[in-house]
Amino acid sequence: MDPHETLVKNPYAHISIPRAHLRPELGQQRKAGPSSAESRPLPVRSCTLEPLEEAPGPKGTKGRPASQQPCKPCGSGQRPAGLAYAGPPPAQRGDDIAHHCWCCPCCSCCHCPRFCRCHSCCCVVS
């Protein structure tokens, strides 16, 4: 081992520069508020569909009324039906878990299956 290496491991370790000083325009953007779609929270009521009335009567599987028609995704139909999870879904990026379904709602405001993460009201995963 080099004797100089034991004395000076990192010559810049004593320098501390806050990130705002490195890019001052970021500090100004932060004060002005979020401007990108990624930093804005999702609107809670983004569905255009009206809430379904909860009719008392016999319940099917998973507590849903037994008389409802099969699940119809709101998208272009590329995703297969049944992508709702019984528990929290995997949290990796790119997981196909945003199955937006209007006929088997978990809450009255967005009509999505449980743990779909389409809206903030359905986000159970931290």
Curated annotation (Swiss-Prot):
It comes from Bos taurus (Bovine). This is Cysteine-rich tail protein 1. One of its GO terms (biological process) is establishment of skin barrier. The gene is CYSRT1. Residues 1-89 are annotated as: Disordered. It comes from the Eukaryota. GO terms for cellular component: cornified envelope. Signal peptide: none annotated. PANTHER family: CYSTEINE-RICH TAIL PROTEIN 1. Component of the stratum corneum that may contribute to epidermal antimicrobial host defenses. Its main location: other.
